[in-house]
């Protein structure tokens, strides 16, 4: 490990204090660092003039790892680019729950372990998400957490038909559906009543959101399944697809959303060696205090 990209969420890391502290620790340990913004900021946002921001797309060509500073959303945003470049990522939580993050902002000294090789890598399953309209692929993305198909802002329910390997698994009316990875089981899926699943297992979770059918429950499918979702014939309105909380994509009647296990896997850097159950217990206890 020689070259590290630091990607702070400028709306979370006030004054960039956390990323600058981390940069000093890493440089003192002999590592080369670059600070890059993970996304474009608002035009009215004042970036400090004394920090030199490098271009993320260029730095990804040469980096050995990416450290994300923010909440899980920041990590999810960076996971796609890092994974496509086969670069592992490490999360430093400056958010609320932060299930994916390895460190809290008070644990920055542990970053020195990157220089000495005292870390391990976790492989996390990702989802491949496509939408076909007639014969054309009109949308494609990858997800570390989930793909959510929802009714949007309208008050009426959305009617969905869900199949696994071409066989109908459920048809229901409700607020929508979440197809998630085990990593995503502690995110939106959990809020919709889905189970907590160990993140290193290989499953696909199918979780209805506020289903009006009492028999529509979360399904834990094999990672070998292909899940297809369409608006049911009884549907009156469009639906919207969002991957890892990203920008919503409109689904029309006849569109087919397909979700399956991706060939790509996100590599998460582990420094602490903590049990997943310790993480779950600590996060929920901290959030409820």
Positions of the model-derived regions?
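ATP/nucleoside-binding phosphotransfer catalytic cores, i.e., glycine-rich phosphate-binding loops
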Residues: 149, 165-168, 217-289
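Catalytic core of DAGKc-family lipid kinases
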Residues: 97-175
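ATP/NTP phosphate-donor binding region
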Residues: 1-65, 106-122, 131-141
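Short glycine-rich anion-binding loops that position phosphate/pyrophosphate groups of nucleotides
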Residues: 11, 72-74, 97, 183-185
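Redox-cofactor binding/interface segments in oxidoreductases and associated redox assembly factors
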Residues: 6, 68, 179
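Gly/Ser/Thr-rich active-site loops/lids in small-molecule metabolic enzymes
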Residues: 170-215
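Short, acidic/small-residue loops that bind anionic groups at enzyme active sites
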Residues: 85-103
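Short glycine/serine/threonine-rich phosphate/pyrophosphate-binding segments
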Residues: 15-16, 73-78, 186-191
């Amino acid at each position: 490990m020689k070259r590290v990209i630091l990607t702070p969420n400028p709306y979370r890391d006030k004054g960039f204090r956390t990323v600058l502290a981390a940069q000093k620790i890493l440089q003192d340990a002999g590592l080369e660092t670059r600070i890059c913004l993970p996304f474009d900021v608002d035009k009215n946002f004042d970036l400090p003039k004394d920090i030199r921001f490098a271009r993320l797309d260029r730095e990804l060509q040469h980096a050995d790892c990416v450290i994300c500073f923010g909440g899980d959303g920041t990590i999810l945003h960076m996971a796609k680019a890092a994974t496509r470049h086969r670069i592992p990522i490490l999360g430093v939580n400056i958010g609320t729950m932060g299930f994916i993050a390895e460190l809290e902002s008070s644990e920055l000294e542990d970053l020195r372990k990157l220089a000495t090789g005292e870390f391990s890598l976790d492989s996390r399953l990702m989802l491949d998400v496509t939408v076909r309209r007639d014969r054309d692929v009109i949308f494609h993305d990858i997800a570390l957490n989930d793909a959510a198909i929802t009714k949007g802002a309208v008050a009426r329910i959305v009617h969905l038909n869900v199949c696994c390997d071409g066989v109908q698994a459920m048809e229901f009316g409700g607020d929508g559906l979440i197809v998630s990875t085990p990593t995503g089981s502690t995110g939106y899926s959990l809020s919709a009543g889905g189970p907590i699943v160990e993140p290193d297992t290989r499953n696909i979770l199918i979780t209805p959101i506020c289903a009006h059918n009492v028999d529509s429950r979360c399904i834990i499918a094999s990672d070998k399944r292909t899940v297809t979702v369409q608006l049911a014939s009884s549907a009156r309105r469009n639906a919207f697809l969002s991957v890892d909380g990203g920008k919503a994509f409109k689904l029309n009647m006849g569109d087919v959303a397909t979700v399956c296990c991706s060939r790509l896997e996100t590599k998460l850097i582990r420094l602490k060696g903590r049990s997943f159950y310790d993480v779950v217990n600590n996060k929920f206890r901290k959030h409820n205090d």
